[in-house]
């Protein structure tokens, strides 16, 4: 049975009144109309603005569960938590672990991908820089071994879509080329790479920056490192830049500047969410490392008298980021592009990221502050 939704809709970068027909889980038609035009009989009025649902490239968990728990039920719960909050498509992200734990995690997440709960797997580590390890266990960081890499890719059965790495490590450039040739997106992150090393990695096939600015050397005018190199690569070489635009990882001014320089087609808003997303303050863990969430910011736990620990993932959802950035002055079409069509295009999800005929019927309804009020996934309202 066809359902017709009528109301404001974000289509091709503009909000217009439209009727969106949904049939068997897909968008059957999108028809712009005048507000004064008579409604199709039986159509449902939508209270808010319809927009394509969000695609999160970088998510570790939420709702008290995490993909790093190495438990199938917990992983499914984390995925559904983000679906219900507007990210109906996502990569399930793992962190640095032992080889055995990574293999187990990849196998569990590959099953979830087979079931359609997630759209792939992101390995964040273990081939990262110790000096920029952030919330990764430095004892488990290592140079890439292609035999180990291939074991993980085989365990993923084609579902490993992104790998974050520090290209300056011994064998890092070889890993970039190997991932590219294996159909996996090499992402530069947790790195001390120089400007030249980033350029070399981009030339070898790296096409993504993992949470730009975070876990990278600050931009210095005499010794430019990864940050300006990746910004330049976004403008000239088609690299996509992840931004955790939640106000804790980056200032809103920084986000707006990157959007102005690179444009929304080269920026992907990501949550980097951990199990604490949607839960609140308190103690948690990530990849076996203890952390505490206070005031909505997660940090590694330190001993008495020790300095404050590194930020350890996010506690927001992509929907929260979109609302925040719209309130900070970024236009809704730009914010929505960075949350939906840009990451969908990177992942090759041709039926996501836009309200158009033939797309999977994944949409969000937004209020006047760009907050998500309803979510549809594959033609089904998730609040029904």
How would you describe each model-predicted region?
Residues 1-38:
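N-terminal metal-binding scaffold of metallo-dependent hydrolase/deaminase domains
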Residues 154-281, 304:
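Active-site core of metal-dependent hydrolases
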Residues 79, 103-110, 149-150, 176, ...:
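Generic structural signal for well-ordered alpha-helices
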Residues 57-60, 80-91, 130-157, 200-216, ...:
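Active-site gating loops and adjacent loop-to-helix segments of metal-dependent hydrolytic enzymes
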Residues 58, 123, 179, 209, ...:
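Conserved, mostly hydrophobic/aromatic
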Residues 228-241, 259-271, 276-357, 363-366:
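His/Asp/Glu-enriched, well-ordered alpha-helical/loop segment
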